[in-house]
Amino acid sequence: MAFGPVGIRCPDHASATGRTAAPRRTARRAKASLSRQGPFVTFALIGINVAVFLLELATGATINGQGGTIWRNGVLYGPVVADGEWWRLLTSAFLHYGPLHLGMNMLVLWFIGPALEDYLGHARYLLLYIVSGLAGAAGALIFHPNAFTVGASGAIWGLMGAALLLEARRIYVFGGQAMGLVVFNLIFTFLIPGISIGGHIGGLIGGAVAALAFSSLRRKPALATLSVAAVGVVSVALALSQV
């Protein structure tokens, strides 16, 4: 979730040396699943974000995405969230400040989304994305409750946090490149003015915690799903406590 474009690093999806047998089997199953169905959730999320931006323009927003009916009713802004407009915690993740902001975020999602969707499965991947977006909104409100914040990068940072956590558990979704991906984007987060640092950090933490639940409770999928949903509930509660 950001005021400007986030940094991009195309992860290397090639196999890394030194994997354990379990990650190799997981990778093979994931590739088989992808060949049958494809990462349609990732593609759908990209399509929704693009469609929402076009609707912003059609409802009076300027080319940089500001103004208009959809932007006014969807942007994350602490004082109106405090008045009960809690849906902004989620809707703001589908709004963007102009074509460049949208394009950069969607390009990152295009690069990193399919690998995680392969590993987690479509439903759990979508839950991870939503929970990460909510955690990003909470982080944004903690750091800057009176700022107007929009963008998918809180959710995208959650995907990066999930990849980093999985890599720490020797599950190499990005061929061992998750740490480099996160560090590269952290540099952009702190160097480029106007980026929502809280949104990025919140998403990163939320995604990592969600991935921890998914990987630790993989033999208990129902409990894992409930645990990740609880991360989303806590994120909403934390966000509302800041306004």
Q: Model-derived features: where do they sit?
A:
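A detector for small-residue-rich transmembrane helices and their helix-helix packing motifs
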Residues: F3-V243
